[in-house]
């Protein structure tokens, strides 16, 4: 049995559970994996990126039992001192991470209509983990809480007041755990004091969002009440004129639910290219001269640059533009194209720095002469969740020093 405490981080999706085990002293990852096919006929568990192993068809508790078995095989099960759960939506009830209690569970349930697929999955994971680890303190970390510092003028829609007052219709933002982690690392990398800083962070993956961070606090973000607003993404449309959607509905007799599905699952890079939602596929097609792949990438880049520029207006100063997420960390092409469109800020990209692989880790990619610095910082949401669990669980470690 290991002689040191570990933190188990759990991220329950609608059909999967991603998990990581981190050393509570250093927050280094000791084990990670994913259970897929929750509540499906075929379920699998893969560890550390290895080959998936078939599991008996099972729900969240069965999948967590399989994960617990994997921990036991590695003498980690008895070392689990804290469990951190990623929860997609905290509404306006949760402004920070919290220790899970019955009241917290009830409040999560209360706001779950805002993100039914993800929140109810998280609630199932929490209930299962509580049964499997009854003596372990558990913490909820919300994807929306970092953005609860937005001012009303930044989170309100231009809709009748009653929709906000009676239904809670407003902008909440997402990717908050990633934006919070990356903004902290950016301050260290750029040598900036938190209370005198202005950053724009571009979290670019299959889901993508921009966040303006002023003096360590989120002051604007591109996603809204749902993750559909903002940037064009892998399969999501991003910002679309509602009038255009109403016109399409009238012409095609599609329902609101039909169009929501189209905007979420058949649009974005996939919709324009007609080829793929995977940027790696589209980049290959770009180099092969595929016209619609090139158009999809150009549209993607245009939206990113426009949102970065717009979010800079929420800052009192612009110290850095930071790329993160799977695309932001790995795509030399996207970073170059976005940076070219931000020349108005005096941003100059260093070609050699930009071409460094992500294995280099945190790195500056702007030229020395650039008026605004630009960096790549690999996100680590699991580490951020573990740090929150450690802080709330009052385990004093070197990772918090």
From Swiss-Prot:
Q: Which GO terms describe its cellular component?
A: cytosol
Q: What cofactor requirement does the entry state?
A: Mg(2+)
What the entry lists under Gene3D superfamilies is as follows:
3.30.420.40
This chain's protein is named Propionate kinase
**Protein residues bound to ATP:** 11, 18, 175, 203-207, 278-280, 326-330
> What is the scientific name of the source organism?
Klebsiella pneumoniae (strain 342)
Which of this chain's residues are annotated to bind substrate?
86
Enzyme class per UniProt: transferase
Q: What residues bind Mg(2+), as annotated?
A: 11
The alphabetized UniProt keywords are: ATP-binding, Kinase, Magnesium, Metal-binding, Nucleotide-binding, Transferase
Which residues act catalytically here? 143 (proton donor/acceptor)
Subunit comment: Homodimer.
CDD domains reported in the protein's UniProt record: ASKHA_NBD_AcK_PK
A Pfam match:
Acetate_kinase
- Classification via NCBIfam families: ackA, PRK12379.1
Cite the annotated pathway. Amino-acid degradation; L-threonine degradation via propanoate pathway; propanoate from L-threonine: step 4/4
What reactions does this protein catalyze? propanoate + ATP = propanoyl phosphate + ADP
**What biological-process terms (Gene Ontology) are attached?**
acetate metabolic process; L-threonine catabolic process to propionate
Q: Which family, according to the similarity comment?
A: Belongs to the acetokinase family. TdcD subfamily.
Listed EC numbers: 2.7.2.15
Superkingdom is Bacteria
InterPro entries the record matches: Ac/propionate_kinase, Aliphatic_acid_kin_short-chain, Aliphatic_acid_kinase_CS, ATPase_NBD, Propionate_kinase
MF-aspect GO terms? acetate kinase activity; ATP binding; metal ion binding; propionate kinase activity
Q: Where is this site: Transition state stabilizer?
A: 175, 236
> Which gene carries the instructions for this protein?
tdcD
């Amino acid at each position: 049995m290991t002689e040191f405490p570990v933190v188990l981080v759990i991220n329950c999706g609608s059909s999967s559970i991603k998990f990581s085990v981190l050393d509570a002293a250093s927050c280094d990852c000791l084990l990670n994996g994913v259970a897929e096919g929750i509540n499906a006929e075929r379920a699998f568990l893969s560890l550390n990126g290895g080959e998936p192993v078939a599991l008996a068809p099972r729900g969240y508790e069965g999948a967590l039992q399989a994960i617990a078995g994997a921990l036991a095989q590695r003498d980690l099960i008895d070392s689990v001192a804290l469990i951190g759960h990623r929860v997609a939506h905290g509404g306006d009830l949760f402004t920070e991470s919290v220790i899970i209690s019955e009241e917290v569970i009830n409040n999560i349930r209360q706001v779950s209509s805002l993100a039914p697929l993800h929140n109810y999955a998280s609630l199932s994971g929490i209930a299962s983990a509580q049964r499997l680890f009854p003596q372990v303190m558990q913490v909820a970390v919300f994807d929306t809480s970092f953005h609860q510092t937005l001012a009303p003028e930044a989170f309100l829609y231009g809709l009748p007041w009653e929709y906000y007052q009676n239904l809670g219709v407003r902008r909440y933002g997402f990717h908050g755990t990633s934006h919070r982690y990356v903004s902290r690392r950016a301050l260290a990398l750029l040598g900036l004091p938190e209370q005198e800083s202005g950053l724009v962070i571009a979290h670019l993956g299959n889901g993508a969002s921009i966040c303006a961070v002023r003096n360590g606090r989120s002051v604007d973000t591109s996603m809204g009440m749902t993750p559909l607003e903002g940037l064009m993404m892998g399969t999501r449309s991003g910002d679309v004129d509602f009038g255009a959607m109403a016109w399409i509905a009238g012409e095609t007799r599609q329902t609101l639910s039909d169009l929501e599905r189209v905007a979420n699952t058949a649009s974005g890079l996939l919709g324009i290219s007609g080829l793929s939602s995977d940027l790696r596929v589209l980049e290959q097609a770009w180099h092969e001269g595929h016209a619609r792949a090139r158009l999809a990438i150009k549209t993607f880049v245009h939206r990113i640059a426009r949102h970065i520029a717009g979010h800079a207006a929420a800052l009192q100063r612009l110290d850095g533009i930071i790329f993160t997420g799977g695309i932001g960390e790995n795509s030399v092409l996207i970073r170059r194209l976005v940076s070219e469109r931000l020349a108005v800020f005096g941003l100059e990209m260093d070609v050699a720095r930009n071409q460094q692989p992500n294995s280099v880790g945190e790195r500056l990619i702007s030229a020395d002469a650039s008026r605004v610095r630009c960096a790549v910082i690999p996100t680590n949401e699991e580490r951020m969740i573990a740090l929150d669990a450690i802080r709330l669980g009052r385990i004093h470690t070197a990772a918090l020093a």
